[in-house]
Design a protein with these regions (language model features):
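An acidic/histidine-cluster motif and surrounding catalytic segment
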Residues: 1-128, 137-174
């Protein structure tokens, strides 16, 4: 399983579109804060419907913008080595932005996602949902390595809400 970092990533992946340094907080038609999701890919893997699914499934406290980046395994290996000291590809990494209105980036390894989907016996689009949700929870401050099961409980509830049967934390226990 991947991990999280507090380092800003937009500069590191160069995936986020250039824009102003200050971001406005996304709101719905009623002016209520909401989650805005942008999905970008540097390869052939696409994720139709992932942004909308994550917006509907995310916990209520998820407010602001998040970028979900689908990258080659080689790129996530570089990021994993740089930020976590692990010279291997992982499935998902989360990088909190630390700026108002922007939660951060969830980076998913396309090849790892394909392999894990095959092993789990489901479509790669399902795997992308599992990974994106897991990464988003890290952006919101959850840490399954230190929180005595709190993240696992939240992930399980949201996963059911979004129609998924198992999440990364349960898989990691097998």
């Amino acid at each position: 399983m991947g991990g999280s970092s507090r380092a800003g990533l937009a500069v590191q992946t160069r995936l986020a579109p250039p824009g102003p340094k200050t971001r406005t907080r996304p709101t719905n038609a009623k002016g209520r804060a909401m989650l805005a999701v942008d999905v970008v890919s540097t390869g052939r893997l696409r994720a139709p419907g992932l942004a909308g699914w994550l917006q509907v499934t995310a916990p209520k406290k998820a407010r602001g913008a998040v970028t979900v980046a689908l990258v080659p395994d080689t790129r996530i290996r570089q990021l994993n080595a740089r930020y976590r000291g692990k010279n291997s590809a992982t499935d998902v990494l989360s990088f909190a932005a630390g700026e108002p209105g922007f939660l951060g980036e969830v980076v998913i390894a396309s090849g790892v996602a394909r392999r894990q989907a095959r092993q789990a016996g489901h479509a790669v689009q399902v795997e992308l949902r599992v990974l994106a949700l897991h990464g988003l929870l890290h952006l919101l401050g959850y840490d399954h390595e230190r929180d005595d099961g709190r993240m696992a409980r939240v992930e399980r509830r949201l996963r059911r809400k979004g129609g998924l049967r198992e999440g990364l934390i349960e898989r990691g226990r097998q």
